[in-house]
């Protein structure tokens, strides 16, 4: 059995309940405000007006630069965010660069905290990579003179599944504007 000292002074039950209520209210109010934080990006994705070029740029050499809009505070979140773009883009990881841009309004809400950076941006980043990959596959298919439906992308290369012909991302981007 545990003995406790009845003479020990601490917080009262009432103080504990009041403190818990205040802390709980702060969490609920703080959390309820989060839904509006990413509203603009969510609306743009739903409306189909999302421009992937704000968050991803590619040059004629096939280098993909992912613009990271969350602060680096020691966990290298840039790698995780760039990876979520790169996986959908089907780009060779050696061709990926990370950029931490200025705080212009075009980047949206640039807050970092609460381990939410990946959670808040994963859907957007996946769509960025997928839309760029689709554009590259369509452009590569056009250069090869084949239907895009029979082409796929992997490791920075678009391949025609029928003939086996290929076009690298750098070949596509050096001859075509996407």
Task: List each model region and its residues.
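N-terminal secretory signal peptides
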Residues: 1-11
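Short, surface-exposed loop/turn segments at secondary-structure boundaries that line and modulate
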Residues: 3-4, 63-84, 94-130, 134, ...
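N-terminal export signals
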Residues: 9, 15-37
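Conserved beta-alpha junction segments in alpha/beta enzyme cores
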Residues: 36-84
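Short, surface-exposed charged micro-motifs
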Residues: 55-57, 88, 143, 149-150
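Phosphate-handling active-site elements
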Residues: 89-93
């Amino acid at each position: 059995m545990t003995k406790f000292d009845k003479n020990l002074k601490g917080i009262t039950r009432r103080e504990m309940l009041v403190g818990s209520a205040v802390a709980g209210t702060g969490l609920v109010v703080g959390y309820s405000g989060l839904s509006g934080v990413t509203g603009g990006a969510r609306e743009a994705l739903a409306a189909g007006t999302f421009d992937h070029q704000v968050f991803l740029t590619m040059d004629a050499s096939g280098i993909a630069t992912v613009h990271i809009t969350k602060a680096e505070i020691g966990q290298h979140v840039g790698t995780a965010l760039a990876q979520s773009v790169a996986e959908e883009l089907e780009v060779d990881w050696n061709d990926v660069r990370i950029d931490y841009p200025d705080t212009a309004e075009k980047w949206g809400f640039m807050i970092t905290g609460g381990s939410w950076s990946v959670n808040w941006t994963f859907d957007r980043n996946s769509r960025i990579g997928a839309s760029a990959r689709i554009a590259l596959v369509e452009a590569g298919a056009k250069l090869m003179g084949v239907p895009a439906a029979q082409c796929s992308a992997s490791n920075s290369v678009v391949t025609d599944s029928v003939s086996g012909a290929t076009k690298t991302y750098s070949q596509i981007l050096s001859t075509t504007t996407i």
